[in-house]
Amino acid sequence: MKKAVNFLLRLGLVAGCLAYAFWGLNFQEFWQVVLRFNGWAIVVTSLYSLLGYVAAGLRLNYLTRFDAGNRICFDAYMLSMGVNNIAPAKLGEVSKAFFLRTKCKYSLARTLSIVFWERFFDLNALLLMGCAVAVIFKVQLAFVPLAAGVLSIWGVLGLIKYFPATAQWIVDKVPVARLRTGLGQVREQLVHGVNLPFFLLLGLYTAGCWLLYAGTAVLAVNWVAHIPLPLDKVLAVFVISSVGMALPSSPGAMGVYEAAMVFAMGLFGVDKGSALAVALLLHMMMFVPTTVYGMWVFLKSGMTLKKIHDAEEQGGQ
């Protein structure tokens, strides 16, 4: 019953987003926008976008303390992206953890902690960029919850770091085994392993990843589509669309990402046809290479969606 309700909610979200993105669209004008795209710029921007995936692989290798190797970590990252693009649920992180466990013989706790730090710093990057956008455009109502979100997360980590006994008591009360195992590993790392240099270097890796991601959006909007939005507004569009991409919805966030882009660019006076054309282009730049390469890794590894589902269920017991 719970799965059915979850599916219906996601289906409703996707349907609403698709209706929002395409409702009232003049397809003739939309096609004219597409025809005006700079073909050479599309090629260069597509190649440039791959740098973000390379950076993400380097960051993942750093999180393994340079034990797994850049190639395995790049494959793991692309696999997770590819699985998220085709699977009906957000199984990408599970596939990444499963791949690292298989290739590197890591424990469940270690792979969960690696994925936790990766996603946690991505969340921090997204929240901090959201705060910056809220300040630049004087949207105080958005700034307050975003800032509160960042501070509360770090507050919890501070509690774990400086009050380990209390933190362990809380972890022991968590009813979900997989979450309890992951939190226990995070606690152990905070108390005995990670330190300020670890956080600073991980922050630099994360900043590098997101700067490269943002660069793709800037090139697509300003160079490929010839839309004269200033840099701060393009970055605001990037942040809002990234939130849409992160929402649990359809495989690959199809529909949700496009709606987020149309909404964000509409805030700055960009017409729906131009906004949707850029959204579809950017989405294909993200979708095609990650799906093709990710599925190649998937098939080469002998992995199946059933194995990933089984790994998820075993971890949650």
Where on the chain are the PLM-derived regions?
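Predominantly cytoplasmic-facing regulatory/coupling regions of multi-pass membrane proteins
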Residues: 1-78, 136-246, 279-280, 285-317
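Membrane-interface alpha-helices at helix entry/exit sites of multi-pass transporters
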Residues: 72-75, 93-94, 106-119, 270-281
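Short intracellular "coupling" helices and adjacent cytoplasmic loop segments at the cytosolic face
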Residues: 78-95, 102
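Membrane-embedded alpha-helical segments of transport systems
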Residues: 83-87, 112-134, 277-292
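Transmembrane alpha-helix interface/packing and boundary motifs in multi-pass membrane proteins
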Residues: 83-88, 238-254, 258
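Transmembrane helix boundary and interhelical loop/hinge segments in multi-pass membrane proteins
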Residues: 91-97, 256-261
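Interfacial segments of multi-pass membrane proteins
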Residues: 100-107, 259-274
